[in-house]
Amino acid sequence: MAASAVCRAAGAGTRVLLRTRRSPALLRSSDLRGTATYAQALQSVPETQVSQLDNGLRVASEQSSQPTCTVGVWIDAGSRYESEKNNGAGYFVEHLAFKGTKNRPGNALEKEVESMGAHLNAYSTREHTAYYIKALSKDLPKAVELLADIVQNCSLEDSQIEKERDVILQELQENDTSMRDVVFNYLHATAFQGTPLAQSVEGPSENVRKLSRADLTEYLSRHYKAPRMVLAAAGGLEHRQLLDLAQKHFSGLSGTYDEDAVPTLSPCRFTGSQICHREDGLPLAHVAIAVEGPGWAHPDNVALQVANAIIGHYDCTYGGGAHLSSPLASIAATNKLCQSFQTFNICYADTGLLGAHFVCDHMSIDDMMFVLQGQWMRLCTSATESEVLRGKNLLRNALVSHLDGTTPVCEDIGRSLLTYGRRIPLAEWESRIAEVDARVVREVCSKYFYDQCPAVAGFGPIEQLPDYNRIRSGMFWLRF
C-alpha cells in the first residue's frame, strides 16, 4: 500500500513537472530567473573610501551590513627595514604590544579586549606589520582607541622585555621544527644573500638575547610614523565615523622625520644559488625552487598568477589521482612522486620569489624536480588556450573567495594601500584577468622562467637533490 502511494505521488509529480515545463507564464516568472551575473556581482561590491589626516595617516574602509567589523593598523615596517644588528626588533615590538601599554599596564589590555568579546591579533612580515581587532560594530570606538594606544604607547618596561625575550627564544626553537618555515627562510637567505630580504622576520637568537630597550625605542620612533600607516576597517561601520575616531585618537601621531632618519628600501639583488641542509633522520625532504619574480605593482603578476594556477597544487590526502586537472598534480599522483606541492608568488616592493615547494620521499627528489621544471618549460613554449581558461577561472575563484569576511577584506585594504597606494577594485582585477591569453602566458613565463638562474633550498634527507648545474640546465630546452 505504501509503495503504491509513493508511485501515485511520483506520477502526479511528473505530470505537474511536465505541465510546468510547457507553461510560458512560469518561464517568464521573475522569481525563477537567474541571479546576478558574475560581472554584475563584481560591480556591486561596496566602494572603498579613503581619506587622509593632516599628519599623513591614511584612513580607509569598506562598509557592509554585517553586525561585526574588523579594524586594524597596517605599517610599513618589517625585517627588510632592519640592519644585521637590530634584525628582529620589529617582531620583538609586536610581541610587547600584547603585554600592556602605558595607559593599560600588565594584563589590563587583554581584559579589556576580552570584556568586549573581541579578538586582538598581530603579525609581522618582511615589509609590513599589522595590528587588528575583530569586534561587534557597536564597539568600533573602543577598538580604535585600543589600537591607537597600542601603536603610540607601547610599554617598554625592562621586566616585561626580559620576560618576552624568553618567550621569543622559545618560539624560535619551535619554529625550527616547522620544516616549511625553515626551507623558506633558507630560500630567502640564498636568493637575496647579502641584502635585507635575506633576514628572517624573527631575527637570529643572538639578536634576541642582545636587543635592548634603547634598540626597541629607536625602532618605534623611526618606523611608527603616521605617513607609514593605514587605519583600515571593514564591516558594519560608516567611513565618517571611522575618520572622526582616527582624528580623535591618531592626530597626535608624529608625521615628520629628521632629514637623515627617513627609512628607505635598499635594492635587493637576486642571486641564483643553492643551499642544502641535509638531515637524513627526517622522514621527508622539503625542497623549494624559485626564480626572481616581479614586485607587487608589476603588470606581469596577473599572468604569472594564472600560470601558477595552471601548475596548481597537490596533497596526497586530497585524493583525485590521475583525474586531477593539473598535469603536474596528475603526474605526481600517478607516479607517487611527492606527498604535496604548491606554487607561490611571494611579492615585495621591487622584487619577488616565483616558484614551487614540494615535500617528497628522498628517492623521488630528482624525478619531482625534473617533472616540475618540465611543466615550467611547457608553459613557456606551448601553453594552450583551454588550460589558460582553466587557470583564469581558478584565479577568479581564489580572488573572490579570499575576500569572505570582514578580516580578509580589512587586511586586503590595509595591504593594498601600502603596496599599490590604492585598493584595486574587483572589477579591475577581472578586466586584467580577462586580458590574459595563451600567448601572454607563454611570453611572461619565458621572461621569468626560461633560461633563468633559480634559487634552490633543500632541507631533510636530500642526498638525491640534483647538483645546481643540473638544475640550471633544466631551465631551458634544446628543442626546435
Swiss-Prot record:
Its main location: mitochondrion. InterPro entries: Metalloenz_LuxS/M16, MPP/UQCRC_Complex, Pept_M16_N, Peptidase_M16_C. The keyword Transit peptide applies. One of its GO terms (molecular function) is metal ion binding. Pfam families: Peptidase_M16, Peptidase_M16_C. It comes from the Eukaryota. Component of the ubiquinol-cytochrome c oxidoreductase, a multisubunit transmembrane complex that is part of the mitochondrial electron transport chain which drives oxidative phosphorylation. Component of the ubiquinol-cytochrome c oxidoreductase (cytochrome b-c1 complex, complex III, CIII), a multisubunit enzyme composed of 11 subunits. The complex is composed of 3 respiratory subunits cytochrome b, cytochrome c1 and Rieske protein UQCRFS1, 2 core protein subunits UQCRC1/QCR1 and UQCRC2/QCR2, and 6 low-molecular weight protein subunits UQCRH/QCR6, UQCRB/QCR7, UQCRQ/QCR8, UQCR10/QCR9, UQCR11/QCR10 and subunit 9, the cleavage product of Rieske protein UQCRFS1. This is Cytochrome b-c1 complex subunit 1, mitochondrial. It comes from Bos taurus. The gene is UQCRC1.
